[in-house]
């Protein structure tokens, strides 16, 4: 398929949840990606953080093929060695006690929101459940994470939203401090905001 065929087919059958750049990727190696028209471009997004080893990485492919030759999926109903070993390694390297593997950033943030509120409820009672987020943040497309996202244009069409979220301007310590009352159980923030540019919060924030 050439680019127009790919684009027209995708536009016809895929839900328009994302804006696409006018390019179709067909292959690549490391940070170099090949387009359907033969162009070679550099991937500065790392596949939005997914392809951190680059595209078509030899070590990743070898590990993937070795595992797929054994069993491709077991669900969470059963134990399996690769998951146990990965969890152990992550805990040892990060200093945390437990890890949870998720399918997306939105799912991870949903779990973090639930975990923060559950911990706060158990420790402080039911009236300490507010989560502070930053204006212009982006935390996901589920109902909880789109509420945590501090951008009005994401809030237009999906009312009513989940309660218990407040927003502060990134870098404004005074505005942030004023939100820290006795109802706050957690803060969710991006140290570097990626929506609308690369916005770095000050070190002393």
Residue ranges with predicted function:
Residues 12, 40-126:
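Glycine-rich loop-to-alpha-helix module at the N-terminal edge of alpha/beta enzyme cores
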Residues 87-189:
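PLP-dependent aspartate aminotransferase-fold enzymes
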